[in-house]
Design a protein with these regions (language model features):
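Bacterial N-terminal signal peptides that target proteins for export
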Residues: 2-18
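C-terminal motif of bacterial Sec signal peptides marking the signal peptidase cleavage site
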Residues: 25-28
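Bacterial signal peptide processing site
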Residues: 30-33
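Predominantly extracytoplasmic/ectodomain segments of secreted and cell-surface proteins
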Residues: 35-37, 75
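First exposed extracellular module after export/assembly in secreted or surface-exposed proteins
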Residues: 43-208
Length: 208
């Protein structure tokens, strides 16, 4: 009798463990599937070389986001960061070391405005429920409908979402979904990139 009970408990625990592993694998697959590979994105920033930047501000306060882009000026990469704090100020971070400038910041997602690099790049920040996120700054629906790569998203009044000036769709920065202005069930959410950050003074990586 004792052996029978033991066997049942063992089988129950085994099945429970296998179910847990299966759920983890499914979640992992979902996370991987959500990463956009349509446009190349590779961003690497050494926070320890630039303490106190708005890049880290965005990753250490829930509901704080920043628009990130880059341009090479006089042989050095300049990183541009504009927080959603309502001040409408863009911080310029000059990468002054050879090690930093060895990296290539040409590919930061879909944006490709040669006149104003600050309209390109991605948006990153810390959500309330899903940790750090990085979204492409271009409207995915206008990219598909009209072609080209110049449909930059801008902050809305509450600065927890962004709006496309062309189609007027509004996207949540918490989830990347459309909250207003949707046209059909086939509307696309924001394109998402993988983000890695271990805390203040550590490297920031965004890419696909």
């Amino acid at each position: 009798m004792k052996n029978s009970i033991y066997n049942k408990v063992y089988i129950y625990n085994k099945v429970k463990s296998m179910a847990g592993i299966a759920m983890l694998l499914l979640c992992s697959c979902d996370a991987e599937n959500s990463i956009s590979t349509q446009y190349p994105c590779q961003f690497y920033f050494k926070s320890q070389y630039h303490p106190g930047t708005s890049l880290e501000t965005a990753l250490n306060g829930t509901g704080v986001y920043t628009m990130v882009s880059a341009k090479k000026v006089n042989g050095a990469w300049n990183i541009y960061s504009t927080l959603n704090d309502g001040k409408n100020q863009t911080e310029t971070i000059i990468l002054s070391t050879a090690k930093e400038n060895y990296a290539n910041y040409t590919y930061l997602g879909a944006g490709n405005d040669p006149k104003d690099a600050r309209k390109n790049g991605f948006i990153m920040g810390l959500t309330n429920f899903s940790g750090p996120v990085a979204w492409d700054r271009q409207c995915p629906n206008c990219l598909e409908q009209y072609g080209g790569t110049n449909y930059p998203l801008e902050w809305t009044g509450n600065r927890q979402s962004v709006i496309c000036d062309k189609c007027k769709r509004i996207y949540s920065l918490e989830y990347g979904t459309i909250t207003s202005g949707g046209k059909s069930k086939s509307d696309k959410p924001l394109m998402q990139y993988r983000i890695t950050y271990g805390g203040k003074g550590t490297d920031i990586y965004v890419g696909n």
